[in-house]
C-alpha cells in the first residue's frame, strides 16, 4: 500500500494541492522493526506523518503500545527422583490463547498461571516434587497449554487425583464465558531420573503464582483502551540446570512500560531468579486533540458522509519508534481493508482501495 500510494501521488496528483511530501520506506517491519530502529534522527523534516500500515477502512489509529521482554532464569540443583512416589503428568489444555496485546483484555486463561495453581497446592498439601514444567511458546502469545511431570507420595496419589478434579471444575467455572474448552487432566507417568531441588521448586511456583499477569491499567485518554499490561508467556526447562520464564510488558506510556517491567522483574528477583530485560521498543501515546487527526476525521466525513472510528491498538507499530526519533511529529495510521494478514490467506478488499486513495489525497489537500 505504501509503495502504491506514493506512486499514485507522484503520477496522478497533478492539480491536487498538497504540501511538500517526504516518503519513508522501512524494511523488516513484521519480524524486527529493523528499518524503524535504524531511522536517523536527521532524515525527516516534516511535521505530520501519515502511516499507511493500518488494515481497516473507516478507522484512524492514533496510538499503539510499546513493548519489552522480561526473562527470569532460575538455577536449580538436580536431585535423584525419590523412591516411594507415584509419578504423574498434568496437562492443562483447551484454552483459546491469543495475541498478548490485542486479546489481553478478553479475560482469557493463561495456562502457565492455571497449572501453577495445581502444582503449588500439591506442593503445600502433599509434598509434590517437580521434575519438569513446559508451558507456552511465543513471547507475544497468551499461552494455551502447559504440562508438568511430578511425583507425590504413593499413599496420596488418589488425593492428588481428587485435587486435580477440583481444580478442573474450578477452572471450568471461572472461564466458562471465555475458555469453555479448558481441561485439566492428570495421568500416570514414568519415573524421571531427577527432580529439581525443593527450595528452587517452591521459589519458582511462588513466583509464578505471585507475578502480575493481564491488564495493569486502562487508558485515561481513550475509554476502553488497555494502556499497560503484562503476559506470562512461557516456562521452559533448559540445559545447565536452568528454568527460563519469559514474559512481555506493553504500554502506550513509556514510563508505565518501564514500571511494569520493573514490577515483574522484582517479583522474580525476590524469588532468587536472575532477570534480564530486552531492548524493547517505544509506544505511541494517543493524542485525541491532534490537528492531523481533526483534519483526517473531517476529510473522511466530507468524502463518505460518516464519521471514522478513532482507535488505538495495544500492540506495536513503527510509529512509536518514529516518535522516539521525532518527538514533535503528529501522526495517524490509516489504510484499506486487509484480511488474513501474515498468513497464506492474506488478501486485500479491492473496493476499499479507491476510498483509501481519495481519503489520503483529501488529507494532503487539506494540510
Where are the language model's segments positioned?
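Active-site-adjacent substrate-binding region
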Residues: 103, 110-112, 117-133, 278, ...
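His/Asp/Glu-rich mid-to-C-terminal helical/loop segments that flank catalytic regions of hydrolases
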Residues: 41-42, 108-125, 152-157, 202-209, ...
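Hard-cation-handling environments
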Residues: 163-241
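Single conserved hydrophobic/aromatic residue that forms the stacking wall/gate
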Residues: 1-4, 9
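Short amphipathic alpha-helices in soluble, non-transmembrane regions
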Residues: 158-172, 259-268
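Zn-dependent metallopeptidase/amidohydrolase metal-coordination segment
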Residues: 220, 227-243, 248, 297-298, ...
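A short beta-alpha structural unit
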Residues: 147-149, 183-195, 233, 244-254, ...
Amino acid at each position: 500500500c505504501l509503495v502504491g500510494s506514493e506512486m499514485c501521488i507522484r503520477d496522478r496528483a497533478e492539480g491536487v494541492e498538497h504540501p511538500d511530501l517526504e516518503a519513508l520506506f522501512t524494511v523488516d517491519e513484521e519480524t524486527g522493526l529493523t528499518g524503524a530502529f535504524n531511522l536517523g534522527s536527521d532524515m525527516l523534516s516534516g511535521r505530520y506523518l501519515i502511516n499507511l500500515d493500518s488494515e481497516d477502512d473507516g478507522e484512524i489509529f492514533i496510538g499503539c503500545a510499546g513493548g519489552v521482554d522480561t526473562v527470569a532464569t532460575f538455577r536449580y540443583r538436580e536431585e535423584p527422583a525419590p523412591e516411594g512416589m507415584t509419578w504423574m503428568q498434568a496437562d492443562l489444555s483447551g484454552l483459546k490463547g491469543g495475541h498478548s496485546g490485542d486479546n489481553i483484555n478478553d479475560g482469557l486463561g493463561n495456562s502457565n498461571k492455571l497449572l501453577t495453581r495445581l502444582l503449588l497446592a500439591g506442593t503445600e498439601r502433599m509434598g509434590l516434587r517437580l521434575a519438569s514444567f513446559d508451558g507456552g511458546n511465543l513471547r507475544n502469545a497468551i499461552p494455551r497449554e502447559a504440562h508438568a511431570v511430578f511425583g507425590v507420595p504413593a499413599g496420596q496419589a488418589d488425593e492428588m487425583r481428587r485435587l486435580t478434579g477440583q481444580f478442573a471444575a474450578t477452572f471450568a467455572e471461572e472461564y466458562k464465558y471465555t475458555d469453555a474448552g479448558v481441561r485439566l487432566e492428570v495421568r500416570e507417568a514414568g519415573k524421571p531420573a531427577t527432580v529439581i531441588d525443593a527450595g528452587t521448586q517452591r521459589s519458582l511456583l511462588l513466583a509464578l503464582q505471585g507475578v502480575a499477569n493481564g491488564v495493569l491499567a486502562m487508558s485515561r485518554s481513550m475509554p476502553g483502551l488497555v494502556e499497560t499490561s503484562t503476559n506470562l508467556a512461557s516456562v521452559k526447562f533448559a540445559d545447565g540446570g536452568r528454568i527460563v520464564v519469559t514474559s512481555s510488558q506493553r504500554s502506550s506510556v513509556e514510563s508505565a512500560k518501564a514500571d511494569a517491567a520493573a514490577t515483574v522483574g522484582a517479583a522474580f528477583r525476590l524469588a532468587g531468579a536472575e532477570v534480564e530485560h530486552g531492548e524493547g521498543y517505544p509506544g505511541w501515546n494517543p493524542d485525541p486533540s491532534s490537528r492531523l487527526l481533526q483534519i483526517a476525521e473531517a476529510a473522511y466525513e466530507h468524502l463518505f458522509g460518516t464519521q471514522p472510528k478513532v482507535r488505538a491498538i495495544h500492540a506495536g507499530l513503527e510509529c512509536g519508534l518514529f516518535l522516539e526519533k521525532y518527538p514533535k511529529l503528529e501522526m495517524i495510521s490509516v489504510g484499506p481493508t486487509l484480511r488474513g494478514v501474515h498468513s497464506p490467506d492474506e488478501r486485500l478488499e479491492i473496493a476499499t482501495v479507491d476510498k483509501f486513495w481519495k481519503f489520503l489525497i483529501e488529507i494532503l489537500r487539506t494540510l
